[in-house]
A protein has these predicted regions:
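Charge-rich, intrinsically disordered N-terminal extensions
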Residues: 1-117
Length: 117
């Protein structure tokens, strides 16, 4: 459940393996620091699962976005920009409840990232 290196394999799309791996590792590092900062290990199992699912989905979106844009990007800046509007990127178009959970996690992640600057 806690973000880990195996997530980078889930996020690979095969277009630019080197860039996908680089951005994926950066995202995992950010998500791990956020996990610690949020003290999620001391939260309920369901809370950890919600955060894990949202972070995993956000990571997948971020890797795809970075590769599609084909511009060198910093993972911190990419996620900061994606979460700065008060919500996260639209990932769950047909699943409003899942999108709300993602948005909640993204708001907290934004606070964490903004605090890091």
């Amino acid at each position: 459940m806690k973000p880990n290196e195996s997530w980078t394999e889930d996020w690979r799309i095969g277009v630019s393996p080197a860039e996908e791996g680089k951005i994926g590792r950066e995202l995992v590092a950010i998500f791990q620091r956020f996990w610690e900062w949020s003290d999620l290990e001391n939260r309920s199992k369901s809370t950890r699962q919600r955060y894990s699912g949202a972070l995993h989905a956000l990571g997948s979106w971020a890797v795809e976005k970075a590769v599609e844009d084909n511009v060198p990007v910093d993972a911190h800046q990419l996620v900061l920009e994606a979460t700065s509007g008060g919500d996260g990127p639209l990932i769950y178009l047909d699943r409003e409840e899942w999108q709300k959970e993602l948005d909640t996690v993204c708001r907290k992640l934004y606070k964490f990232l903004a605090f890091q600057c």
